[in-house]
Design a protein with these regions (language model features):
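Helix-turn-helix
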Residues: 6-8, 12, 16-54, 58
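Hydrophobic/aromatic residues within well-ordered alpha-helical segments
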Residues: 52, 59, 63, 67, ...
Length: 195
């Protein structure tokens, strides 16, 4: 098959699989579906990835790469903790809203259990991000001298849950536009977390 030699890279396979997983769901998408969408033979697909689980792992890993690059690395250099947190909310929300980064949606939506060694690696990266957010919230609480009613951990889970659920209902042509959503979510979070 001529297409076998034209396939750009593993990234093209991952982008296509992410699109299919997003549209159909992980369980409803077969390796045949992915191969067909790429105009590859099944053998050509297996040359790059041994299993659908391996594809899902790489999609989730790429989603974490995107989060680290576009959120964590983007805010690390901001010295003021409150401004750093405001920017984190903005950047994380923009990542979730980005249609280009289907990997994020797949990671947020798919609860299919990966094989334990792969799941452990993804979970470790997710925990690192949660701790980063939690520590930043604690730092803002110290600077603002809040009364400590809201724990940084509970606030981190609330913030991430609030932002990560957006992909379920947000429509670019809807009543809430991205910038307005960023402002409102930031206001809601700051009003509740820093009493």
């Amino acid at each position: 098959m001529i297409r076998e030699t034209l396939i750009d890279s593993r990234q093209e396979i991952l982008r296509t699989a992410a699109r299919l997983f997003q549209q159909r769901g992980y369980d409803a998408t077969s390796m045949n579906d992915v191969a067909s969408a790429l105009k590859l033979s099944k053998g050509g697909l297996y040359h790059h990835f041994q299993s659908k689980d391996e594809i899902l792992f790489h999609i989730m890993s790429h989603a974490m790469d995107i989060t680290e690059e576009k959120v964590v690395n983007a805010v690390r250099g901001i010295s003021d903790p409150e401004e750093r947190l405001r920017m984190l909310i903005r950047r994380h929300l923009n990542v979730v809203l980005s249609v280009r980064d289907r990997e994020i949606t797949v990671m947020l939506h798919e609860n299919h259990p990966l094989p334990p060694p792969l799941q452990k690696r993804i979970n470790a990266r997710k925990k690192d991000y949660i701790h980063f957010v939690e520590n930043l919230i604690a730092e803002v609480q110290r600077v603002k001298r809040t009364n400590g009613v809201v724990s940084p951990r509970a606030a981190a889970f609330a913030l991430l849950g609030m932002i990560n659920w957006i992909y379920q209902w947000y429509r670019p042509d809807g009543a809430l536009l991205g910038e307005d959503l960023v402002r409102q979510y930031t206001d809601i979070f700051f009003a509740g977390a820093f009493q």
